[in-house]
Amino acid sequence: VKEAANLLTTIVYSNVRKFSVIPGITHFLLGGADTSLHLYDLYADGSITEVDDFVSSGSGSVMAYGVLEAYYKKDMTEAEGVDMAIKSVNAAMQRDSCTGEGIDVYVITKAGMKKAASKKVNTKAE
C-alpha cells in the first residue's frame, strides 16, 4: 500500500505544472491493506502523510474535522462509522458552499464493497 501511495503522489506531483484536461493538482486519500490497514493523505506537492485514525480533505474539511474528532472512536461499528461520515460531510455542506449537496457512503470490508447510504441535502434558501 505504501508503494502505491508513493507512485500516486509521484504521478500527481509530476503533473503539477503540465497542462492537461485531466486535473493534476488534486488531493488524494488512499487506503488499503497488506500486512495491516493503512490510510494515506497525498498532497499535490508530493508529500505523503500516513494517518492512524481518520482524515478529511477539501474546502469543508475544517467543519468535517470537528465532527470526526467528536465522534470517532476505535472499534466503531459499521453503523456508527456510516453515521459519523454522514454527520461530518453534512456539517461541511451546511457551512461551505463548495462542498456540494450530497453524499454517497460506501463500506469496504474483506467481503467487498457496498453502498451504505446516499443522501442529498437541500442547501438552497427557500
Which stretches of residues belong to each language-model region?
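Long, low-complexity N-terminal extensions
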Residues: 1-126
